[in-house]
Regions:
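Class I S-adenosylmethionine-dependent transferase superfamily signal
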Residues: 31, 55, 119
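Conserved catalytic/acceptor-binding region of the Class I
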Residues: 120, 124-193
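A short acidic, Gly/Pro-enriched loop at the edge of an enzyme's catalytic core
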Residues: 89-100
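Conserved class I S-adenosyl-L-methionine
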Residues: 1-37, 50
Length: 253
């Protein structure tokens, strides 16, 4: 029996929608170059729609699913996006009914042995499956090595023991996830944002390990960490670019 994909984000779904970075338009332009006009996309584990709403009208419809109704409740309305609650590994979709399956920052939570057969069933022959992740934010250009070292210490030393085991796939940039599809070469793409301290702290609040730290009975670690960052934060109110290189796995069925 297929189990539910682990849900580490419903409790912070509002912060997730507000502070998780958006993906660059270059990513969606690349995807559209692989698709026919009038394509249908299944955006699986869509969260609050971070990757669902950025396609041109070349794409007729995006069906954005997530097992968390709390996440979907914060997704933005869009005329070509239909939101629905569904697991990743078992869906109500007809056979060969979509042209592409996308998974943004979520594949590592899935039951791989169940998801990939379901994706093959749902996507049309020769269709595309794409999954991508971003791991540790690079702040050295914007904020310098001192703040980078502080965030890394928070990541590994303070909340490190509370990361779910699947997080290792992200740190390994998806290189150790089996991907049983004919690979497509992808360009190098990075997320870039300009953030103030509130933006950085809001993003950290969306981490699954922060929620698990609190669920384990510890006090919220973020207020103390914020005070430490405030002591070394540059005088400029907004700094950038903060960036994350994307690791993209993409292939055809």
């Amino acid at each position: 029996m297929v189990g539910r994909t682990k849900d580490y984000f419903s409790k912070q779904s509002k912060a997730y929608q507000q502070f998780r970075p958006s993906y660059p338009q270059a990513l969606f332009d690349f995807f559209e170059s692989l698709l026919p006009d009038g394509a249908i996309i299944w955006d699986c584990a869509a969260g609050s729609g971070q990757a669902s709403v950025h396609y041109s009208d070349k794409v007729a419809c995006v069906i954005a699913t997530d097992q968390s109704d709390k996440q979907l409740a914060h997704a933005p309305a869009h005329p070509r996006v239909r939101y629905a609650q569904s697991m990743a590994e078992v869906t109500p979709f007809p056979d060969h009914s979509v042209d592409m399956v996308t998974v943004a920052q979520a594949l590592h939570w899935f039951d791989f042995d169940a998801f990939f057969p379901e994706a093959r069933r749902v996507v049309r022959p020769g269709g595309v499956v794409a999954a991508w992740t971003y791991s540790f934010l690079d702040v050295t250009r914007a904020l310098g090595t001192e703040i980078d070292a502080a965030i890394r210490s928070f990541y590994y030393d303070v909340i490190g023991p509370h990361w779910p085991p699947e997080r290792r796939f992200v740190d390994e940039r998806y290189t150790t996830i089996p991907f049983p599809l004919a690979p497509i070469e992808a360009p190098q793409i990075s997320i870039e944002v300009s953030w103030d301290l509130d933006g950085v702290m809001g993003y950290l609040a969306t981490w699954s390990s922060v929620q698990r730290y609190k669920d384990a009975g510890f006090d919220d670690p973020l207020p103390e960490f914020r005070r430490m960052l405030e002591a070394v934060w540059p005088s400029e109110e907004v700094l950038g670019p903060v960036h994350w290189p994307l690791a993209l796995k993409i292939g055809r069925t």
